[in-house]
Amino acid sequence: MIALTEQRKEELSSLENLDADLEELARQSKKALEALQATALKLTTSRQEAAARYDKAVSDILHTLGMPKAIFETSIETQMLSPNGADKIEFTLAPNPGEGFKSLQKAVSGGELSRVLLSIKSVMADLDRVPLLIFDEVDSGISGEVGNSIGEALKNLGQHHQVLTITHLHQVASRAKNQLAVSKEEIEGRTYTHVVELDHDGRIKELSRMLGGESDTIREHARQLLEV
């Protein structure tokens, strides 16, 4: 009976202290939330500072890849706290003067997206260790010196990643370590695709074709491209 009485006294004491315990928990919760918000604010500030440098670096590379007026911008908007902070982050692009910023996920053409990706990967080359990168239409609608710039950017990127590029430009193809020729053939009403790895002589022949002919002068030009 005495033991039961003591037990009831302890239970009653616990109930009497419940309000105090709840107040302490509320105080601790508020303190933790304030610390979390302060940390999230620091993270937001760091992201904004890094984004300014990052956006300029990506835009500068885009200007050499046939998009001289393009502006790349990292959009940072406030959202509810999450494990990733209090920011909603989206990469956007204004391809030409007078055009608004477009989400890379929604309104950018394939060629533009490939060049943006090439620019991003070039900026992040030393940090990003994705083993394989594939570029399609990266040279869409361009030629001349811009083609050389794209070829050089892809070649530099190949020092950090394996890069697979589908191209129609000799400036790009000539900078590859390995070159494959893709052709289609119709046999009895069906279309077949052939892929052939080219040796040195095969590359000269294919580059000559891409240059527009197979004269001795063009073949010599193709040979020189492989020596650059």
Question: What spans do the regions from the language model cover?
Answer:
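Extended, charged alpha-helical coiled-coil/arm scaffolds that mediate oligomerization and mechanical coupling
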Residues: M1-L65, K69
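Conserved ABC ATPase signature
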Residues: L81-L118, S140-G144, E197
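GG-anchored amphipathic helix commonly corresponding to the ABC/SMC/Rad50 NBD signature/C-loop
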Residues: P95-P97, G111-L133, L157
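Walker B catalytic acidic pair
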Residues: D136-E137
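Long, charged, glycine-rich C-terminal linkers/tails
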Residues: H63-S82, D87
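C-terminal lobe/lid and adjacent interdomain/linker elements of RecA-like ASCE P-loop ATPase modules
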Residues: E145-V228
